Amino acid sequence: MHHVRMVKLPAEASDPHALRSRARRSWLVFAAVALVLLAAGLLLARDYGRSQALAGLAGQSRIDASLKASLLRAVVERQRALPLVLADDAAIRGALLSPDRPSLDRINRKLEALATSAEAAVIYLIDRSGVAVAASNWQEPTSFVGNDYAFRDYFRLAVRDGMAEHFAMGTVSNRPGLYISRRVDGPGGPLGVIVAKLEFDGVEADWQASGKPAYVTDRRGIVLITSLPSWRFMTTKPIAEDRLAPIRESLQFGDAPLLPLPFRKIEARPDGSSTLDALLPGDSTAAFLRVETMVPSTNWRLEQLSPLKAPLAAGAREAQLLTLAALVPLLALAALLLRRRQVVAMRSAEERLARNALEASVEERTRDLRMARDRLETEIADHRQTTEKLQAVQQDLVQANRLAILGQVAAGVAHEINQPVATIRAYADNARTFLHRGQTVTAAENMESIAELTERVGAITDELRRFARKGHFAAGPTAMKEVVEGALMLLRSRFAGRMDAIRLDLPPDGLQALGNRIRLEQVLINLLQNALEAIGDSEDGAIQVRCEEAAGGIALTVADNGPGIAADVREELFTPFNTSKEDGLGLGLAISKEIVSDYGGTIEVESGPSGTTFAVNLKKA
């Protein structure tokens, strides 16, 4: 008979009602803590996501701005060549020396043709006094011929320095543009100035289509080129009145008031960019990220505004979703642990109450308890037996799976080592013959080749073992010339007398693909073997092997003039164990495709009555 010693516990620990009350309080505290954590996590995630999105947007915006600046430079550089060439033109110089009507008419037509072909807004010739004597727009109502440009900086600076570039509003056309000028010199000194005007309508249209406001400013901060026409000739910062007066008097920007750009809340960032609010046409305000870069070969600065609202919202949303994805499972786990603890405590309390209530009758129920214990031990034993049987079944399943994989590997090895083994046998027969003849040097060379081929057999079996378990050889730069030569070496003995049918274009030494030499040799051997078997003993049989660069990669092609592949066979050509040969296993092309796929390449096949072409496309190293 068993005697149970009773231990008195605190009332709260053994009272289920007290435990339930405490559990409700615990859940209220847990809910409050969870809400605080979620709120704090979402707020922090929002700020972090916005910060990361802003950094990413800044990087992309700098790339966009640099690209725009490079394209703008290309446009300007293309037009700079016109005045440079025309300044040395004999006809231009002759027209300034003898400005008669026939010579000026010829110059007008010449400039008109040049402006059309070079996409210049206008090209015009100014004499020594500053009056335009010829222009590409000589037939238009806004012709520059006869106008006095002596006050223009691009004329004065070109006469003084030989060349000048000046952005201004046209006094006749009322269209802004860049004036590129060169002095025309004669035997006695300056004869005049040739000017090409470049307008940026196409550039501005492209910028406008991008949806990101962009503009170019000069060294004074005045906007010259912009995707928003209303911002033209505005300034990035206020200009002092004593500096504004001479700019307005020069008529460089017409009657533009030169007001500051409508930017507010400008905040600089450590990376050189800044955020701001801009008033857009239509009285709408939006937040932007501003980045800037210099336009090469000019003193211009290109600034681009990237909208902030959508990227920041997306960054905050993504970070908050990730935070929820992390916090919700953790909170769920915490709730589960809390619930489990409460259930365990409640169960323990109930058990203790039941034990206290049955304390008086424990002696009478000892026998029943012993019997219950025996039944429990029996059930435990049964459970252990069931568990052992289940483990045995699981081990049988694992063993069966291993046997299936070993079957695939064995089938692959039987196919792939057939080629080098046949070559080894041929080398061995030749070595024996050479030994009988006393040609020991040649026999030794054959034995060395056999040693190399045995190493290659070991490499092939290792490769096929890895193929059967979906393994991968590390990819690296592989010389395609060595791949082609290695494959031909393996096939030379087996197909002796038929190798002359192969027409080979060896790749250059420096041509390297991304892959592994031995595995790529396997692919080429399979393709060449199929091609040699396809042409058979035909006297006019031919195989063309070519390896060259193509479409950013490397194309290795094997083409034969055999009878081609039947349509029903071609549909499942790369399916394992699918073959039309009596002694074939149907694994060669399947393995080849798997090898090429491992290195990011593809195999394509074209077949017809006149022959079959396999194309292996690989990545260039």
Swiss-Prot record:
A cellular-component GO term for this protein: plasma membrane
Keywords tagged on the record: ATP-binding, Cell inner membrane, Cell membrane, Kinase, Membrane, Nucleotide-binding, Phosphoprotein, Plasmid, Transferase, Transmembrane, Transmembrane helix, Two-component regulatory system
SUPFAM superfamilies: ATPase domain of HSP90 chaperone/DNA topoisomerase II/histidine kinase, Homodimeric domain of signal transducing histidine kinase, Sensory domain-like
Positions on the Periplasmic side per record topology: 46-320
EC number(s) given by UniProt: 2.7.13.3
Subcellular location: Cell inner membrane
Gene3D superfamilies assigned: 1.10.287.130, 1.20.5.170, 6.10.250.3020, Histidine kinase-like ATPase, C-terminal domain (3.30.565.10), PAS domain (3.30.450.20)
Changes after translation: Autophosphorylated.
Residues with the Phosphohistidine modification: H415
GO molecular function, one term: phosphorelay sensor kinase activity
Residue ranges occupied by any Histidine kinase domain in the UniProt entry: 412-621
Membrane topology listed for this record: Multi-pass membrane protein
Positions in coiled-coil regions: none
Record field: catalytic activity: ATP + protein L-histidine = ADP + protein N-phospho-L-histidine
Residue ranges of the TM segments: 27-45, 321-338
Function: Member of the two-component regulatory system DctB/DctD involved in the transport of C4-dicarboxylates. DctB functions as a membrane-associated protein kinase that phosphorylates DctD in response to environmental signals.
Protein name: C4-dicarboxylate transport sensor protein DctB
